[in-house]
């Protein structure tokens, strides 16, 4: 591609530097996806591309990485979004942990007979969600609910106003709170 000839600023890790609108250090040049080095996930690249297109069109938008879900597609699935306990400890951010076995979801039990699972939520002192981690099927399908709560900074009381259909595995988040 000849990117090295454009004089693009790089990060300490050697990735192409971008701002919140996916603009590089060279005017009129935008970057998204793996070469920016943020999450290396297809779903992140799609969102980065949307932000870049919005910037080109003059629409207000900004890339946020605080709620990018990650999924391990095993059986059972593992999914997480937001911070982990380790990252919160390193950042010195106070938090509380709520753990709830997936067996609290009747739908999970019916669809995963004899299988265990766990839902772990990490909450800030202001009752907003900092991170969520799920072990059990369909973790990949329900983790987005937690990501939305993180991105929108929903408090526990706001989260509890949401009506979840019953029975669904996703209502495990509401049960945990």
Model-based region annotation:
Residues 38-46, 54-87:
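Rossmann-like dinucleotide-binding cores of NAD(P)H-dependent redox enzymes
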Residues 4-6, 11, 18, 37, ...:
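Short, electropositive, low-hydrophobicity segments enriched in small/polar residues
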Residues 9-12, 59-69, 93-98:
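A short alpha-helix-loop-beta-strand transition element characteristic
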Residues 28, 68-69, 128-130:
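Short amphipathic alpha-helical segments
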Residues 1-57:
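FAD-site-proximal beta/loop scaffold in flavoenzymes
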Residues 57, 74-84, 89-177:
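Flexible, glycine-rich terminal cap/loop adjacent to redox cofactors
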Residues 23-24, 28, 64-65, 111-113:
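Solvent-exposed alpha-helices and their adjacent loops that cap or buttress functional pockets
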């Amino acid at each position: 591609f000849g990117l090295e000839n454009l004089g693009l600023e790089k990060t300490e890790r050697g990735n192409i530097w971008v701002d919140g609108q996916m603009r590089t250090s060279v005017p009129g040049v935008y970057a998204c996806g793996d070469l920016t080095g943020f999450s290396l996930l297809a779903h992140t690249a799609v969102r980065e591309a949307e932000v870049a297109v919005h910037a080109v069109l003059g629409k207000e938008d900004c890339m946020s990485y605080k709620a990018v879900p990650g999924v391990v597609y095993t059986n059972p699935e593992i999914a997480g979004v937001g911070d982990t306990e380790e990252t919160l400890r390193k950042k010195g951010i106070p938090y509380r942990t709520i753990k709830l076995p997936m067996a609290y979801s009747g739908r999970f039990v019916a669809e995963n007979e004899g299988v265990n699972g766990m839902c772990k939520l990490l909450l800030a002192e202001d009752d907003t969600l900092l991170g969520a981690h799920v072990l059990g099927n369909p973790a990949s399908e329900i983790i987005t609910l937690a990501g939305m709560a993180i991105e929108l900074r929903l408090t526990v009381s706001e989260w509890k106003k949401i009506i979840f259909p019953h029975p669904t595995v996703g209502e495990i988040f509401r049960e945990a709170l």
